[in-house]
Amino acid sequence: MELINKKIMVTGGCSGIGRELVEKLIAEGSLVGILDINKSAFSEIEKISPNVYCMECDITNPSSVEDSVEKFHKLHGSIDILVNNAGILYSSPLVGITLQGLKKHGYKEWTKVIDTNLNSLFYVTSNVVEKMLEQRVKGVIVNISSVCSAGNAGQSAYSAAKAGVNALTSTWSKELSSIGIRVVGISPGYIDTSSTRKALSVSNIQNIRQEIPLKRLAQVSEIIDAILFVIKNDYFNGKILEIDGGLIVS
């Protein structure tokens, strides 16, 4: 699939991987719609190109999602590709030992991570696929997962959410492939971003680097290259592409 003139929706496109992905898609000639709650970044991003359209959207709110998808669809008449990129990191053991005593993983934090990283995926994808089916679009759904989907100490909510993302990728591929919609996933390892540095201590990051055979974190551009690969390769379907520098095999 070529990207020129394709109508693409990206969740969480105002920062991090999403922001750089949007710029790359624009350079490829795509028409991009961003779903993001960070309205303050819209004016700067929309200066990049007239072909990017920002929509304030709480992806954990089904009504907000439905309205945003409808707006983009009315603007361009169709939706070809969805990249479910938005997500948050949160690290906490199930029950931690602190100087003040035992501390359980917060229920509020659990719900927020699951809502943002998993439930939102269902809300956005169901609305986009509905539009695709109405117009018989042969589209692509890209879900951003994580190597933590296999389980990672201290990340109960995040790991559970990303495991769910993998399950939905497989399930939706089995449902939608016969009608021309591919569903694929990207499973990055640890990426050199501000959110990673915020979620993990310096010593944790140093230890992670030593566990990765390439001895470094991934660059955002390397993850974006993988996203573009799974979109453009028409025979890649129903699978999760791991981009982790060899972390899993080590």
Task: Describe each region flagged by the PLM.
Residues 177-182, 236-238:
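Short, small/polar-rich loop/turn modules that mediate ligand/substrate recognition or access, typified
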Residues 3-33:
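Canonical Rossmann dinucleotide-binding motif of NAD(H)/NADP(H)-dependent dehydrogenases/reductases
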Residues 130, 173-175:
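Alpha-helical segment proximal to the catalytic Tyr-Lys
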Residues 216-243, 248:
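C-terminal substrate-recognition "lid" of short-chain dehydrogenase/reductases
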Residues 57-68, 107, 222:
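The beta1-alpha1 cofactor-binding region of Rossmann-like NAD(H)/NADP(H)-dependent oxidoreductases
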Residues 88, 102-123, 142, 165:
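Catalytic Tyr-X3-Lys loop
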Residues 89-111, 154-157, 197-200:
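Conserved mid-core segment of classical short-chain dehydrogenase/reductases
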Residues 125, 161:
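Active-site helix of classical SDR
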